[in-house]
Amino acid sequence: MNDSEFHRLADALWLTIEERLDNWDGDSDIDCEINGGVLTLSFENGSKIIINRQEPLHQVWLATKQGGYHFDLKDDEWVCDRSGETFWDLLEQAATQQAGEKVSFR
């Protein structure tokens, strides 16, 4: 994958997250902000989830209260380089815990 392909895929990931949050109908408020390629989800309790792109490594990084995760693209899916879990699974787990209610991005 070259840099432009990586940015296209990361942009698509960011857009999907934004669209899902725009349609969010849960009780808790989740704010989404993008600044310089970093996507920040802010929760009512003051906690945050930070998602950023690591262009030199062609990875997406996810920082949550539970820890940090690095994702590589494998077969059109962002997969954690340590656990093998998908980006969406780990994001939903963290967002659900930090929001205090079930959050789905799919």
UniProtKB/Swiss-Prot annotation:
A GO biological process of this protein is: iron-sulfur cluster assembly
Q: Is the keyword tRNA processing in the record?
A: no
Q: Which domain of life is it from?
A: Bacteria
Matching InterPro entries, A to Z?
CyaY, Frataxin/CyaY, Frataxin/CyaY_sf, Frataxin_CS
One MF term from GO for this chain? ferric iron binding
Q: Name one GO cellular component term.
A: cytosol
Keywords, A to Z?
Answer: Iron, Metal-binding
List the Gene3D superfamilies hit by this protein, alphabetically. Frataxin/CyaY
* Family of this protein: Belongs to the frataxin family.
Say what the protein does: Involved in iron-sulfur (Fe-S) cluster assembly. May act as a regulator of Fe-S biogenesis.
The name of this protein is Iron-sulfur cluster assembly protein CyaY
